[in-house]
Amino acid sequence: MGIRCSTWLRWPLSPQLLLLLLLCPTGSRAQDEDGDYEELMLALPSQEDSLVDEASHVATATFRRCSKEAWRLPGTYVVVLMEETQRLQVEQTAHRLQTWAARRGYVIKVLHVFYDLFPGFLVKMSSDLLGLALKLPHVEYIEEDSLVFAQSIPWNLERIIPAWQQTEEDSSPDGSSQVEVYLLDTSIQSGHREIEGRVTITDFNSVPEEDGTRFHRQASKCDSHGTHLAGVVSGRDAGVAKGTSLHSLRVLNCQGKGTVSGTLIGLEFIRKSQLIQPSGPLVVLLPLAGGYSRILNTACQRLARTGVVLVAAAGNFRDDACLYSPASAPEVITVGATNAQDQPVTLGTLGTNFGRCVDLFAPGKDIIGASSDCSTCYMSQSGTSQAAAHVAGIVAMMLNRDPALTLAELRQRLILFSTKDVINMAWFPEDQRVLTPNRVATLPPSTQETGGQLLCRTVWSAHSGPTRTATATARCAPEEELLSCSSFSRSGRRRGDRIEAIGGQQVCKALNAFGGEGVYAVARCCLLPRVNCSIHNTPAARAGPQTPVHCHQKDHVLTGCSFHWEVENLRAQQQPLLRSRHQPGQCVGHQEASVHASCCHAPGLECKIKEHGIAGPAEQVTVACEAGWTLTGCNVLPGASLPLGAYSVDNVCVARIRDAGRADRTSEEATVAAAICCRSRPSAKASWVHQ
């Protein structure tokens, strides 16, 4: 499941139709299907406009739409222009499309023009004009509008806020907060006792009509979802971040349905508010989900670049969250839902989404919160919307303590201090268990109590696909440093992994092999102040038994090892050794492999290797870094018949091998998981710890 892309072609305009259009009065007005009128200007084509009529002109833009047919909204399209397009060019492009359409007897309506979040415009038009629109100058792609949905069907506060922290107040002495949360949802009953005086109802309203001619808009029902979530975020009694200010933007109708375009306009509204009246830290809660949308993910990325923290529901479809937006946006903190037993939420035949796009889970089952039935009523709701609201509240509390925290720091701290290994992973599909995080959110302690700790997380790539030349790429956030790269293949057929530069950013790339079923790249992404990293490469030695590489720059320490094979040789394939017996602190690989050492320098950075081996049959071996140390690199050392790969799970290195239950295995053939553990002590010098 994903997006389908296609390029549309239009047919040449007939001479008779062209003559008819030219005979029409220049200032005539056309009526669209909604009964609204729009000024259309018909004129002889200019030399520039006539270029589009050349048969040789081929559209370079692409057309995208939701993979779920029932969620599509044909006839409404977001025309996305190149990132560097200027405001005047956006207006000219929209006007040109109107002009070209009018010559062909079509009326289109420009519903909204985007300037502040991305260059583009929302247009209502016939699908017959898509081929024409794709040939417009500056157009990067066109995305058909689609639906998004609300994701909902006092143990929760006890779970995410430890008892010793519940007595602390995270707001200022007068009970206020400098953090503002924007909620994109249904309307809200702002007079409820839980949130009274804390909610600002904006004049923003961008929702589709409700389905069904007999639908009755009951105010309390229309406000239900938004009121409940507002109470979860900042309610007086049932809220997480008590005292936090909320701004309500209505993007979901009374049935809990909205559109991608309405959500985009809502995000741009927030950006405009930022520009007009800069304020303190902003958190945007997106308790909704629709099919994968490139433009919605891009809009989230652009808003995140301005310092806004976005928190999104993973979705309630018991499916891979990467297939939905905004959950799949890398710049969004994506939240799945658990119940009171810290297990994945089941909602009838569906349940919480999962997979590599989920950052962590939070309470999302039978959550007590404000009800819109009356100003003192309460009700329970379930879903990943409620889970996302909990994390939005936690983020607001963290920012209220330390407004300077960035998105990368917030995410890393949420991961570090989450409750780990409590979820029964058997609930998830087998192929998703290794990708899905086993973490439930809790409120982290203040930064003063944990300052200086090296923070790292694991980022998985999408699956590469099965072709022999297929690759997979995992990327860190711009603020993070890529300290190591590894790979994993369920078939074991892979040509290794390496760190390389793409578009000015270091990325982790994994290579599939002939006969392989695909591969994952696994990046270890860390926050390390004043770090300077470089990759040292050694090509295949060929003549010698091993290929060694080490950190030769002064004060640089080894944080990761990787290798790759230029020529496939599965019989000889082995992971790189992290050291030889006489020379610790270097990567040593097979003579036919190119070996890469990730070497970094930062004030007080010190690293060491920790190993654990099993001589008998084993499908996986693990080794963990001690308290105070952070895992930066993970490898499986030779000994297994065929290693499937290695990856980091929080602070644990996991080495996976194909079932190697041979009775004649010896201790020298033990499968070994090797972890590189580092810590940052700013007062000390960078060093390698010999063990």
UniProtKB/Swiss-Prot annotation:
| Protein name in the entry | Proprotein convertase subtilisin/kexin type 9
| One Gene Ontology MF term | low-density lipoprotein particle binding
What does UniProt list as this organism's lineage? Eukaryota, Metazoa, Chordata, Craniata, Vertebrata
The answer to whether UniProt assigns keyword Secreted to this entry is yes
Give the record's GO biological process terms: apoptotic process; cellular response to insulin stimulus; cellular response to starvation; cholesterol homeostasis; cholesterol metabolic process; kidney development; lipoprotein metabolic process; liver development
Functional summary from the UniProt entry: Crucial player in the regulation of plasma cholesterol homeostasis. Binds to low-density lipid receptor family members: low density lipoprotein receptor (LDLR), very low density lipoprotein receptor (VLDLR), apolipoprotein E receptor (LRP1/APOER) and apolipoprotein receptor 2 (LRP8/APOER2), and promotes their degradation in intracellular acidic compartments. Acts via a non-proteolytic mechanism to enhance the degradation of the hepatic LDLR through a clathrin LDLRAP1/ARH-mediated pathway.
* Species annotation: Rattus norvegicus (Rat)
**Gene name in the database record:** Pcsk9
EC numbers, comma separated: 3.4.21.-
Q: Which UniProt keywords apply?
A: Apoptosis, Autocatalytic cleavage, Calcium, Cholesterol metabolism, Cytoplasm, Disulfide bond, Endoplasmic reticulum, Endosome, Glycoprotein, Golgi apparatus, Hydrolase, Lipid metabolism, Lysosome, Phosphoprotein, Protease, Secreted, Serine protease, Signal, Steroid metabolism, Sterol metabolism, Sulfation, Zymogen
Q: Which residues form the propeptide?
A: 31-151
